[in-house]
Amino acid sequence: MTVAFKLEGQNFTALNGGPHFKLNQSISFFVYCESDKKIEKIYNKLAEGGQIIFPLDKYDWSPRYAWVVDKFGLSWQLDVDKINNQQKILPAFLFVNDKVLKVKEAVNYYSAVFPDSKIIMEWPYDKSAGLPDETLLFAQFKLADHLFNAMSGTGEHIFDFNEAFSFVVNCNDQKEVDYYWNKLTSDGGNESQCGWLKDKYGLSW
């Protein structure tokens, strides 16, 4: 079964994919709630039957923030901050393990592939972290006029990008399909079936 729906004016599609791939924290939705009332309402709803990674509280990076895995296994990051854009729900990538140093590289790569791209914000680690210079903790960027967040997570993690979560590129013709297919499967990407592919960082398209 395939279900198409909208949240905050944004298009989503849900598929019945069977037990082969599990949603995990490597990809989440980052929601800019813009008010205490809204973040509390969303947090309480998503936490029902789910798992709280970061409880709703004040943190160094936000006056009110939470990270929740809902009862279906989908991860949500909630931030009370405002965003100067109509898009309030942003896909967020978490680069971990052998990819922890690759946020900047990946953001530059995707920005070169997609039109109407722009790097909006880059937040590097403090030098005290002992990581190479310019290693990014957080980045926000735009691809084809859609906003995304990317983060890195130090330490060992038991999850990584997989096919449970993929991104749909609506193309105008076969020439455009071929362009994205060739770009995203190059340099270590892999072809899959039925129009799916996995790029060199493990993200599915």
Task: Tell me what each language-model feature is.
Residues 39, 103-107, 134, 174-177:
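A structural signal for well-ordered alpha-helical scaffolds and beta->alpha junctions
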Residues 1-23, 76-78, 124-160, 205:
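Conserved short beta-strand elements that form part of the metal-binding/catalytic scaffold
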Residues 73:
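Short, contiguous alpha-helical
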Residues 6-11, 22-23, 28-65, 112-113, ...:
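Vicinal oxygen chelate
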Residues 28, 51, 55, 77-125, ...:
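N-terminal beta-strand motif that seeds the catalytic metal site of vicinal oxygen chelate
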